[in-house]
A protein has these predicted regions:
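Active-site-adjacent "subsite" loops/lids of carbohydrate-active enzymes
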Residues: 1-38
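Active-site neighborhood of glycoside hydrolase catalytic domains
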Residues: 23-135, 139, 150-164
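Substrate-binding cleft of secreted/luminal carbohydrate-active enzymes
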Residues: 132-148, 157-158, 163-245
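Pro/Thr/Ser/Gly-rich low-complexity, intrinsically disordered linker/stalk tracts
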Residues: 223, 227-268, 312-323
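Short proline/glycine-enriched turn/loop motifs at strand-loop junctions of beta-rich domains
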Residues: 266-271, 300-301
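Extracellular low-complexity, O-glycosylation-prone stalks/linkers
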Residues: 269-285
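Short beta-strand segments within Ig-like beta-sandwich modules, predominantly Fibronectin type-III
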Residues: 285-291
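Beta-strand-rich modules
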Residues: 296-315
Length: 323
């Protein structure tokens, strides 16, 4: 369907849906509903585009919309703009919950929370407080350091506001090996990516990572693809990112070993993680992930199995068996 021109606004480098128009707000909800109804998607994701980031001398040019839709309800045009974005964010989650609640809603805002609020009119702090977003993925596309606009500074700021919302960190691997002088010397080698991951790994509220982009990973400039392989060398299960407390799958039963093969009874709709015990009170080692109900063990030891469902909710561990 063609987009009515009257529903759009043009700026120097971008054409956007007019955030102030009720017709636009409804259309976005309709699009989301159509996607999750027609297709078996895991989630709906929104990037960092809300109101546009204006160039010098450019105006938002929305006084007419404020006069028509907002002047009687809001004290300022800035408050009006933030509400327009709030309505879309809140309603996307609502239509998902009402239509197909297993679908996840994620947003990846720019790193600077204050700029999101004052320039893009995205009140991310409010969304997190109200629980309107299931997963937040701040784009921390900066080098590590102690100063303003560093990876560390931005991550610390986000950790103040992330509570019930799942948080994944967005890493800007596209900057590594770039000739753009604005990026700085830290991106001339892969070492800073390792530092970024090390810093994020110390934050208990960080649930995982998202890398932008796959093209740059494959290009392997300054060995960034190799560094990523090293960072991800240990197996892991995908975290559960649902908005409600997970309903755990059934625990695998009748776990047994036979000549180095571990087997168990099937759990409907599940895949499985196999762990090796490192002793009481110590973190077990994930040795394999499989959709089969048997697994070739890597060696002698004590093992257990868990079941995971489509949403990656993980069951309690099975009984321990020793081979």
């Amino acid at each position: 369907t063609k987009i009515p021109v009257a529903w759009t606004k043009d700026y120097n480098k971008i054409r956007i849906y007019n955030p102030a128009m009720p017709e636009v707000q409804t259309r976005i909800m309709d699009i989301v509903k159509e996607i999750i109804t027609k297709y078996d998607v895991d989630g709906i994701h929104m990037d960092d585009y809300f109101y546009p980031s204006l160039e010098e001398g450019e105006s938002m040019n929305d006084n007419a919309e404020y006069e028509k839709y907002g002047k009687d309800k809001f004290k300022s045009i800035e408050e009006f703009r933030r509400n327009n974005v709030d309505v879309v964010i809140q309603n996307i989650q609502k239509v998902i919950i009402d239509t197909k609640p297993g679908v996840i809603f994620s947003v990846s805002p720019a790193a600077n929370i204050d700029n999101n609020y004052s320039k893009l009119f995205a009140d991310v702090r409010k969304w997190l407080k109200e629980g309107w977003v299931d997963v937040i993925i701040p784009q921390l596309y900066f080098a590590t350091g102690t100063g303003k606009n560093s990876f560390n500074q931005f991550l610390d700021q986000w950790m103040q506001y992330v509570n019930q919302t799942h948080c994944l960190i967005g890493y800007g691997i596209y900057k590594f090996g770039s000739t753009d002088p604005d990026y700085g010397n830290a991106f001339h080698s892969s070492a800073d990516l390792k530092s970024q991951f090390e810093y994020a790994s110390k934050k208990s509220k960080v649930n995982g990572s998202v890398l932008y982009s796959i093209k740059d990973m494959v290009a392997n400039k300054v060995g960034i693809g190799t560094a990523i392989k090293e960072i991800y060398k240990k197996k892991t299960v995908i975290p559960y990112l649902g908005r409600t407390e997970a309903k755990l799958p059934s625990t695998p039963v009748k776990v047994r070993t036979d000549g180095g093969n571990l087997s168990w009874e099937a759990v409907p709709g599940a895949y499985y993680a196999v762990y090796k015990s490192n002793g009481e009170g110590k973190l077990a080692t994930l040795v394999g992930i499989t959709r089969e109900t048997s697994f070739k063990l890597p060696g002698k030891g004590t093992y257990c199995v868990t079941a995971l469902d489509k949403a990656n909710a993980e069951s309690r561990i099975s009984e321990l068996v020793t081979y």
